Amino acid sequence: MPDSRPDTELSNPQSAKAPLDPHLKALENESIHIFREVAAEFERPVMLYSIGKDSSVLLHLARKAFYPGRVPFPLLHVNTGWKFSEMIAFRDETAKKYDLDLIEHINPRGKAENITPFTHGSAAFTDIMKTEGLRQALDAGQFDAAFGGARRDEEASRAKERIYSFRTPDHRWDPRNQRPELWNIYNGMIRKGESVRAFPLSNWTEVDIWRYIQAEDIPLVPLYYAKKRPFVERDGMMILAEDPRLELLPGEVRQEGMIRFRTLGDFPLTGAIRSQATTLEEVIAELEIATVSERQGRAIDRDQSGSMEKKKREGYF
């Protein structure tokens, strides 16, 4: 096993930077405490890695929590086969740069049956390729705790979820059966077969995430920054038109414009926004006056009534 301890300032998450402001420092301390608590309480933790900005912050915090050692648990990417190509390139580069144990899982049933967002719709596609795929991967790895990057400010069902989110043996979540969390005391006692989803970023906001990225100089997928890109307008969203699998529907026209993404997922189900924000400073300034949630750009959040809570009850991220 090669020595994975960072030997450059660039790869050292603890390297000298300007001190964090008290608000961000408090959030960072809480997140690091949660990482260490879960690592100490559970036998087989794993970190869910979706390659987006929250995952990048989550990974940075995990590296800080256990520096100068390696991140002591694997990263799990549930791949649907429909991610932006820039996301996959960034994932592979990151795993190599930080010597991470990266597990990639694609639902074999979904792959064999050629389940796609175009042929089966967003609800069925997400259920099979994401929720079912995640349950398969967690069972295969016998993981009893999974770190996720969800934040309470994102969406209503996430707002009421605890930092330790307890799951049944079939990974289901019951929002009416959550344990109290007093201060920073977390009860990790589980029965055989049960598991926990742990959310170190629960109390962060989207602006907190971006300010922390700026303060800590955390690299991101370039899609978060505005650039002239091709797109088509479909179902009220601007869909990136770079993948040859995207076929134009009758009446659709391929356009070009300055766009970026506030959230990243599968490219056919993730809408861009018009933006001129090409730098971190410009992105933060744009977010400070935003009036809608970043999740407005996700088709899976509005494909049926109570969509996100229903998905989470069934085992979604």
UniProtKB/Swiss-Prot annotation:
An annotated GO BP: sulfate assimilation
Keywords, alphabetical: ATP-binding, Nucleotide-binding, Nucleotidyltransferase, Transferase
The protein's annotated pathway: Sulfur metabolism; hydrogen sulfide biosynthesis; sulfite from sulfate: step 1/3
Tree of life domain: Bacteria
InterPro entries for the chain: PAPS_reduct_dom, Rossmann-like_a/b/a_fold, SO4_adenylTrfase_ssu, Sulfate_adenylyltrnsfr_sub2
Reactions it catalyzes: sulfate + ATP + H(+) = adenosine 5'-phosphosulfate + diphosphate
GO molecular function terms listed in the Swiss-Prot or TrEMBL record: ATP binding; sulfate adenylyltransferase (ATP) activity
Record-listed E.C. numbers: 2.7.7.4
Task of the protein: With CysN forms the ATP sulfurylase (ATPS) that catalyzes the adenylation of sulfate producing adenosine 5'-phosphosulfate (APS) and diphosphate, the first enzymatic step in sulfur assimilation pathway. APS synthesis involves the formation of a high-energy phosphoric-sulfuric acid anhydride bond driven by GTP hydrolysis by CysN coupled to ATP hydrolysis by CysD.
Family that this chain belongs to: Belongs to the PAPS reductase family. CysD subfamily.
Record HAMAP family: Sulf_adenylyltr_sub2
Record's protein name: Sulfate adenylyltransferase subunit 2
Native organism taxonomy: Bacteria, Pseudomonadati, Pseudomonadota, Alphaproteobacteria, Hyphomicrobiales
Gene: cysD
